[in-house]
From Swiss-Prot:
Top-level EC class: hydrolase
Pathway: Amino-acid biosynthesis; L-histidine biosynthesis; L-histidine from 5-phospho-alpha-D-ribose 1-diphosphate: step 2/9
Entries under InterPro entries matching the protein: HisE, PRib-ATP_PPHydrolase-like
Any one cellular-component term (Gene Ontology): cytoplasm
EC number: 3.6.1.31
Protein name from the UniProt record: Phosphoribosyl-ATP pyrophosphatase
UniProt-listed SUPFAM superfamilies: all-alpha NTP pyrophosphatases (SSF101386)
Main location (coarse class): cytoplasm
Top-rank lineage group of the source organism: Bacteria
UniProt xrefs under NCBIfam families: histidine_hisI (TIGR03188), PRK00400.1-3 (NF001611), PRK00400.1-5 (NF001613)
Annotated signal peptide: none
GO molecular function per UniProt: ATP binding; phosphoribosyl-ATP diphosphatase activity
Gene transcribed to yield this protein: hisE
Gene3D superfamilies documented for this protein: MazG-like (1.10.287.1080)
Length: 107
């Protein structure tokens, strides 16, 4: 078990995003812009789905790590703090999933 958290990842992404693009993949991706970063996020999402369907546990773990990393990059570019996402998850999980979905459809 590790003590590493998504907050740790968010901080690492923020630090590396400020580096020179020739020194950091994160900085290079951030410099390429949100469209490029979002496409990479989508690619990683598809690879994660394929790993899940293929029941390949090791690959699913690896692709999930890539997916979370690229999500943090997209959030960083959009200036959306992880805490905003976590707050939304907390709000949604304070009620049943079916009730939450109904509330979104009938505001």
């Amino acid at each position: 078990m590790t003590d590493f958290t998504l907050s740790d990842l968010e901080k690492i992404v923020a630090t590396r995003a400020r580096a020179a693009p020739e020194e950091s993949w994160t900085a290079k991706l951030v410099a390429a812009g949100q469209t490029k970063a979002a496409k990479k996020l989508g690619e990683e999402a598809v690879e994660t789905v394929i790993a899940a369907i293929g029941e390949d546990r090791k690959n699913l773990v690896d692709e999930s790590a890539d997916l979370l990393y690229h999500l943090m990059v997209v959030l960083n570019i959009a200036a959306v703090p992880l805490q905003d996402v976590m707050s939304e998850l907390a709000r949604r999980t304070s009620q049943s999933g079916l009730q939450e979905k109904a509330n979104r459809q009938n505001p």
